[in-house]
């Protein structure tokens, strides 16, 4: 299946890609591994190779590579400019049980929400963990999504000014989850709702228009 055909199949509004399908041509990360992706070699205006977009709930997500002079690693960023309940973009060929995920993000616009987040242990569009920072509410939150329903584990007030770059990082091992924003740990929590390996990716909410760059992930 060609890349163009693959990307067209990924753009269903209520996409639920099972992890097994995402890993069909990939490799499992059994040993320590890390990678950083800057989107700088991908074509502007397209969904980057090896990524799958979708939404938990309803809506029309739109994840595209765009030029941005303010990008932490120039020249490109990955921008979510569509709208949906919870739009996500997942790196396929990844399967991490214990490790980390990190991204730089900038909240650009949104009247209902201005959020940037990361997902991990992603099984499909309805089952995963998510941590996000919100520029409208000025807080950092930790959730799990199960059977398509998002549940709050913890949220903490934190400064998240819009139109500025921030670094969101999550470290996870067994039940332990640590969420940091701009190098400061805001949440440490134990939870076991989503166990076992899963994919990693990025996440937004509602009408958030958010730019992402330097997406990093690794296994322990």
Describe each model-derived feature in a short phrase.
Residues 194-220:
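Ligand-recognition surfaces built from glycine- and aromatic
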Residues 146-167:
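Short, aromatic/His-centered strand-loop micro-motif at the edge of beta-sheets
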Residues 33-55, 213:
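Extracellular carbohydrate-recognition regions
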Residues 80-142, 146:
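Secretory/extracellular carbohydrate-interaction modules
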Residues 16-29:
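Bacterial N-terminal signal peptides
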Residues 46-77, 84-85:
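Extracellular glycan-recognition surfaces and repeat-rich motifs
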């Amino acid at each position: 299946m060609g890349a163009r055909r693959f990307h067209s199949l990924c753009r269903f509004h209520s996409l639920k890609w099972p992890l097994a399908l995402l890993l069909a041509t990939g490799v499992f990360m059994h040993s320590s591994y890390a990678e950083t992706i800057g989107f700088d070699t991908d074509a502007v205006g397209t969904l980057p190779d090896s990524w799958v977009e979708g939404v938990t709930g309803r809506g029309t997500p739109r994840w595209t590579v765009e030029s941005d002079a303010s990008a932490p690693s120039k020249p490109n960023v990955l921008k979510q400019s569509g709208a949906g309940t919870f739009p996500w973009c997942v790196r396929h060929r990844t399967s991490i049980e214990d490790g980390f995920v990190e991204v730089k993000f900038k909240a650009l616009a949104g009247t209902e929400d201005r959020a940037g987040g990361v997902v991990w242990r992603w099984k499909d569009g309805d089952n995963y963990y998510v941590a996000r920072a919100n520029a409208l509410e000025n807080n950092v939150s930790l959730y799990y999504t199960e059977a398509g329903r998002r549940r709050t584990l913890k949220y903490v007030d934190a400064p998240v000014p819009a139109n500025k770059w921030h670094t969101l990082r999550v470290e996870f091992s067994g039940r332990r989850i640590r969420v940091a924003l701009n190098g400061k740990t805001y949440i440490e929590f134990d939870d076991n709702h989503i166990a076992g390996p899963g994919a990693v990716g990025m996440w937004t909410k509602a009408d958030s228009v958010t730019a992402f760059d330097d997406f990093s992930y690794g296994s322990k």
